[in-house]
Amino acid sequence: MKRFLTILGLCALPLTLTAPQMAAADGATDAVFSVAIRGITAGTLTVKGSESGGSYKASGVLQSGGLVGLVAKVKYTASASGRVKGNTFSPSRYDEKADTGKRKSSASMTYKGGVPSVSDYVAGPNVVKPSTQKGTVDPMTALYAAFRDVNKDEVCKLDVKMYDGKRRSQVKLATPRADGDMIKCDGEYRRLAGFSSEDMAEKSRFPFNLYYAKTADGRYRVEKVVTHTLYGNAVMKRK
C-alpha cells in the first residue's frame, strides 16, 4: 500500500493527528498537481475531498505522464472515508487500486475502534502488525489531511502518523512564515517502523517545504511542494 504515496518520490506524504484541534468549516478540496522530478515531468496527482457533519470522504489519483509516462504507464487510485473533528481524522475505510502496466492489484483497510484491519496482511520480519497501530490513519486520509484547504490558523499545523498496511511513518508541518505572497512551511517525513535496515540506513528522514496561497474565500490552499528525494529534487505545482 505504500506505493500510492512513495511512487511520487516525494516522501510518501502522510499520518492520529496530534495538532491542536481547530474549528474547521465544512468544505471541499479539488486539486490537481503536476509532478516533476529533476525537472522532468513525471505525472499528475489529483486530490479531492469533502467534509460535512463531522464526516469526510477523500479520493486521489496518481498517474504517470510526460517522459516518464512514455516509459511506464502507471496509475494508482485510492479512496478513504471516516470521521473528522477539527484537525483529527478517524478513518473507517481505505481502498487502493494499482496498475503498473505489468500487473494490477488492490488492497483495503477497515477500522474498528481506531485499529486497522488489512485485507492482504502477511506477517514478515519487518512488517508492523496492524493490531499495534491504533490511532494511525491510512495513506489517502494522510494525503488529504496534508493537502486540504484550511483556515489561516491551521496552516502548517500537522503532526500525523500513518500506517500503510506494513509500515509506520510520520509527517510534520511547522514554522509558518511569509514567502512572497505565500506562506511557507517546513515539513519532514520520517520512517518509523517496518522498513528494512537498508532503507533506514539509506535515509530515514526526508525534509520538504510546502507553500500555501490565500483563496478568494479567505482560506488557504496548497500551491506547491518542494523536496529532495532518493530520486532527485521533486516539485509538485498546483494546476
What function would you assign to each model-found segment?
Residues 14-22:
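C-terminal segment of classical bacterial N-terminal signal peptides
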Residues 25-113, 149-239:
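Acidic, serine/threonine-rich low-complexity disordered tracts
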Residues 89-145:
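Surface-exposed, polar helix/loop patches in the mature regions of secreted/periplasmic/lumenal proteins
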